[in-house]
Structure formats: C-alpha cells, structure tokens
Amino acid sequence: MPRTKEEPELSEFEKQRAANIAERDALLKKLTLEAQSAGIFSKPPASKSSSQTKKKPAPKRVKKEDEPPVPRRMSSRLRGLAAESEIAKRKAEDEYQAMKAAAQAKRMRISGDLNVGDIVVGENKWNETGLQGLGIVNSAQRYQRTFGEEDIKKTTNKELKELREKMSGLQLWEPWEPNRIKITRERIYSMLFHPTESKPLIFAGDKTGHLGILDASQQPDQNESDEEDEYPDPTITTIKPHTNTISAMHIHPSDPSKLYSGSYDSSIRALDLEKSVATEAYAPASSSDDEPLSGIDMAPTDPHVLYFTTLDGFFGRHDMRVSSKANPGDGSAVTFYQLSEKKIGGFSLCPTQPHYMATASLDRTMKVWDLRHLSTKHPKPVGEHESSLSVSHAAFNQKGQIATTSYDNSIKIYDLASKGLKDWKPNHTLSEDEMAPDAVIRHNCQTGKWVTILRPQWQACPDSPVERFCIGNMNRFVDIYTSTGEQLAQLGADVITAVPAVAVFHRTQNWVVGGTGSAKVCLWM
C-alpha cells in the first residue's frame, strides 16, 4: 500500500491567525450586504455561463494579389519642394495684393483734362446742344406732417400767410414720378440748380463719383395709342468725372458755363458745359496724397479763387491762375490752414462780405473766421458756438445770417447782421453770449448710415425780402423755413418712397429739388 502523508498539527499561533481571517471575512460579507440593501453599492453583474459564451468564427483569409512596391515616402524638404501650406499662403497673399492694387487703382484720382464723351456712363450720350447759351446767364415717421394747411390758416401776419401759401403751393413735377427719375448710379450726396431761369437744369453728384444731369423742361415722348405707363423714362446724362464721392458743387455767377465739383478723391474739376471738357481745377501735388474734400465755395466778386475744406480739418485757398502742383518755393497757389483737429463737415462764405466764413465741425463747434487776418500757424476765429453734438453744416445767406444743422436734432440760426457784421473792423471778436443762436428749430437730424447728412441751403436771391432755406425731412418731406425760424412749407407726396435728404433751392426761382439715397429726384415748381 502506498504510504499516506500525515497532515502536520497546527500550532496555537496559526490557529489564532485562521480564526482572525474567518472573523474578518464574515465582517466584510456582512458590511457588503448592508451596503447593497442601502443602495450604496450596485449588485455585481451576474457572470455569464459558459453555455452562453460563443466563440466567434475566425474571418476567412483572402489571398492578396502581389502588388508592385510602393515608392518610399519622402518629405517635401528632402525633395527640394516648398511646403503646400507655404505655396497656398503665398498664392493667397499675391491674390490679395493684386485685388487691393486693382481697387486702389480704380479709386485713384485721374489727372488732366477729361473729355465728357469719354466718361459718359450708360446709354444716354452727352448732348451739349441743350446746354449752349448757358454762359450768358447772369427718427422718422413716414409721411407724418408737422406743418400743413391748418398752420397756414392760423397765420395772422398777412405777408407771412401769403408767402406760406405761395411756397406750399409748389407742385411736384408731373411728367414722371420720382421713382422713375434715377439721376445717378448710387446715393446722392450733392445737388445744384443751374442759375438759368429758362428751364430747370439739375446736377447731382453721388457716392462713387458719378455726375447726373437732368433737363426738367423735357416732356414724355408718348403717342396717343400708347398706354399711360408705357412711355420711356426721362432722358438723363450721367458722366464720371471723379473716382470717389462728389461732396459739393458750385457755379460762379460770372461764368455759368462752368460747373465746379469737389470730391473725396481730393480734386476739384471744372466741367465746361459748352466745350464738354472737365478740367482739373485743383489737385494735391502728388497723386498719392489723400485729402478728401468736404466742401467748396467761391467769392461772388472773384471767379479765380477756390476755397475748400477737407475731412482732416483743413481749409484751403487756391488761385486757379497758378498751378496747384507748383513747388512752394516757386510761389504755390495753394494755402492751407488747419482750423480744426477733426473733420470739417461744411462751410460757406458770406455772399455780401466774402472775407467772412463759417465752418461746421465734428468737434461740435460752429466758428466764424475773418479771412483777412487768418494765420497759417495759429488761426483764431472771430467767434464760436459749441453744440452738444457734432455740427454738420454752416450756411451763410446774403444778409449775414448763418443756418446750421447738428446731431443734437436742431437747426440753429445766427443773425450776425443784427450784430453789425458789415461794419466790423479787422480783428473784431464776438463773445460767447454774442455767438448764441437767435433761433433754434427742433428738427430730426438722425440720418443713420444710409441717408445723406441733412444740410440747410439758402435761396441766394429770393423774390421777397424774406430770407428762406430748405432742408430734408426724415419723414420724407422737404421743409422750408425763414431766417427767423418760421416754417413756410412742407413739400411732399405719397409717391416719394425715400427721404429727399439733399435739398436745394434754385438761385432766383421758387424751384426746389430733393435727392434720395436711391438716387431718385423729387422736383417741385
């Protein structure tokens, strides 16, 4: 028989150790059961039985065909090539620079004379026959009126009532509705009547340098058999003398055949309406100089000198008999004065005292200057008045009164004639109290991004002693006021679909035209 191995007898220490282990296991089991009943531990998942475990079949092996060896990968650096990202980056940069240069070239000022026939835009060609002889001429609530027939009826002053009835009686030009009279390509920034009294001849400058010309004496070419809405739109000539916004226009009374236009492209051009040539009247010495012009004016007594302001706060004086591109040492014809640290939005000379000038600035001031004693180093104004917000424009009339518009929603009128303007001695100054406005008209001037800034414009030679000016109304009207702040008329019509923000008077006739952001024209006569 095989010999069996006897189990050795445990010592007292080992017996005690085994008892301790058993006691510990029992305690752990008890604690685990109590924790599970209290929800602290989840029950261990049940182990799958061996019968439920199935072995997945091994995938079938597919015999691979012999393939040609793949070339070994090499980096672009080892192959002597630039990384693709660098090539793409360089290509994108080159394309960007090319586009930037093309855009800059498109907006760059064109020097020299321009033949009008070469800058005509669109199908309507330039026709100078209708312009011959001009050189011999001496928050807005839509359609909600703030002035109307009831106001006229309540007028007690006989002369004022007659004038209100006369101005309110102006009628919208009938042959075409405003939405069919698109005079330029983009938003209108400036407008002007030709001084001729024989017919309403209207000029409009837009945001991109187009100049539109409308002869409002034309009539629709309509046959009797045609339906009323089938006759063609009015004939409008559009040319492009500038490469940027036409901000201001002027015709000197001694030479009505020339139209001067100032632009954000830093130049002033003189368009000869009879010779059909647009000559460069002023431009900076270098074509790379960027000096956007905000306004132009001329003294009635001097047809040779141009005055202009810039968006950089400068005021310039240019004698057209000398080239503006001459070197300073050769007797340059241009003199600059920095009148403001910020943009000058508009300015005007006093027609009867042209050595006095008014400027309106983004620095919230309207200032009056004496050009006879204007220093290039430290120019000092005759007087100034500060508004709570920026002042957009300052317009002088023939009597020495100034009308301004401001973003504080007001039109302010300053009567310098009553303060002895024509008798002022050189170096005369006005105190703060003397520069206070004589009349303040509440007027919505919050034009926003898509409406041209509202500017008052006086009638140069009215047919009565009452001075008057017109200004666009955000409710889609054109308002007419006197120099004392009394409203004469509110011109409008249901067919006007945009704000006629740019509004101007004819020099002598009671004709008013308004231009909109959609380049449409509203004409009252």
From Swiss-Prot:
GO terms for biological process: DNA damage response; regulation of DNA damage checkpoint. WD repeats lie at residues 183-224, 241-281, 288-328, 339-379, 384-425, 448-491, 494-525. SUPFAM superfamilies: WD40 repeat-like. DNA-binding protein that binds to both single- and double-stranded DNA. Binds preferentially to UV-damaged DNA. May be involved in DNA-metabolic processes. Keywords: DNA damage, DNA-binding, Repeat, WD repeat. Belongs to the WD repeat DDB2/WDR76 family. GO terms for molecular function: DNA binding. This is DNA damage-binding protein CMR1. Residues 223-232 have a biased composition (Acidic residues). It comes from Coccidioides immitis (strain RS) (Valley fever fungus). InterPro entries: WD40/YVTN_repeat-like_dom_sf (IPR015943), WD40_repeat_CS (IPR019775), WD40_repeat_dom_sf (IPR036322), WD40_rpt (IPR001680), WD_repeat_DNA-damage-binding (IPR050853). Residues 38-86, 212-233 are annotated as: Disordered. Residues 53-62 have a biased composition (Basic residues). One of its GO terms (cellular component) is nucleus.
